[in-house]
């Protein structure tokens, strides 16, 4: 080990001063680059989202989820780079010549769009998206859907969950293709669809008081119901 360094229990310490009698107080523990990146990410998320009610303890609890942290760590450099560009352009806008101002405004709007989109990505990656298992939904319907009003309400909730997921993906897809070329945002996000979702219809069958009820819900939230006599 080089002079001025010593190791104990798998940790590496560096001596702060080569003068005087060495004691434990003269050393600092070295951290790996991964630890520093994780600390930087935690600080960034805490400073950015604490006003929304996402606190440091909430962020730290996600550190055990390696895939979530890996995604967030991959997005952070892109966010910082775009934020720096946005700050510089915003500062230059008031003093730049008129023949430059229009082009600068376009670039500024691009940066704002990227930052807004990444805010959504960070937040949804951090807190997770709400979802409901189809089996659980069917159990709820069979247990509680004693009338058409309840059936309609539950189906609308499920439809809204699906629409929210599609809108989140569409938000990324609708970014200007130039932004994608500049940032590689799509590659940084796994499982992002690149086509607008087609209209889907889901049907759930519930029997209540001798009646057979079929309820269909489109992604637009339109309810279609048919009744028939149970066999």
Curated annotation (Swiss-Prot):
Tagged with keyword Phosphoprotein: yes
Locations listed in the record: Virion tegument; Host cytoplasm; Host Golgi apparatus
GO cellular component, one term: host cell Golgi apparatus
The organism's place on the tree of life at top rank: Viruses
InterPro entries linked: Herpes_U44
Main location group: virion
Modifications made to the protein after synthesis: Phosphorylated.
Covalent lipid adducts (S-palmitoyl cysteine), residues: 12
Pfam families (alphabetical): Herpes_U44
Keywords assigned by UniProt, alphabetized: Host cytoplasm, Host Golgi apparatus, Lipoprotein, Palmitate, Phosphoprotein, Virion, Virion tegument
Function as written in the Swiss-Prot or TrEMBL entry: Plays several roles during the time course of infection, including egress of virus particles from the perinuclear space and secondary envelopment of cytoplasmic capsids that bud into specific trans-Golgi network (TGN)-derived membranes.
Family, as annotated: Belongs to the herpesviridae UL51 family.
Subunit structure comment from the entry: Oligomerizes. Interacts with U75; this interaction mediates U75 incorporation to virions.
Protein name in the entry: Tegument protein UL51 homolog
Species per Swiss-Prot/TrEMBL record: Human herpesvirus 6B (strain Z29) (HHV-6 variant B)
Gene behind this protein: U44
């Amino acid at each position: 080990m080089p002079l001025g360094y010593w190791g104990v229990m798998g940790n590496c310490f560096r001596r702060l001063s080569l003068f005087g009698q060495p004691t434990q107080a003269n050393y600092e523990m070295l951290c790996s680059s991964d630890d520093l990146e994780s600390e930087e990410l935690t600080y960034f998320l805490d400073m950015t989202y604490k006003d929304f009610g996402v606190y440091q303890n909430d962020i730290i609890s996600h550190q055990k989820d390696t895939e979530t942290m890996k995604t967030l760590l991959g997005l952070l450099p892109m966010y910082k780079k775009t934020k720096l560009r946005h700050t510089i352009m915003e500062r230059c806008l008031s003093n730049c010549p008129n023949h430059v101002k229009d082009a600068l405004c376009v670039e500024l709007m691009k940066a704002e769009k990227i930052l807004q989109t990444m805010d959504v990505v960070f937040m949804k990656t951090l807190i997770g998206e709400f979802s409901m298992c189809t089996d659980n939904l069917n159990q709820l319907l069979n247990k509680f859907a004693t009338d058409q009003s309840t059936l309609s309400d539950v189906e609308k909730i499920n439809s809204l969950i699906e629409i929210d997921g599609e809108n989140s993906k569409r938000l990324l897809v609708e970014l200007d293709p130039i932004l994608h070329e500049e940032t590689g945002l799509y590659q940084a996000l796994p499982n992002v669809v690149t086509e607008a979702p087609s209209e889907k219809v889901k049907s759930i069958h519930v029997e209540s008081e001798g009646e057979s009820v079929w309820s269909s819900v489109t992604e637009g939230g339109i309810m279609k119901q048919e009744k028939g006599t149970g066999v």
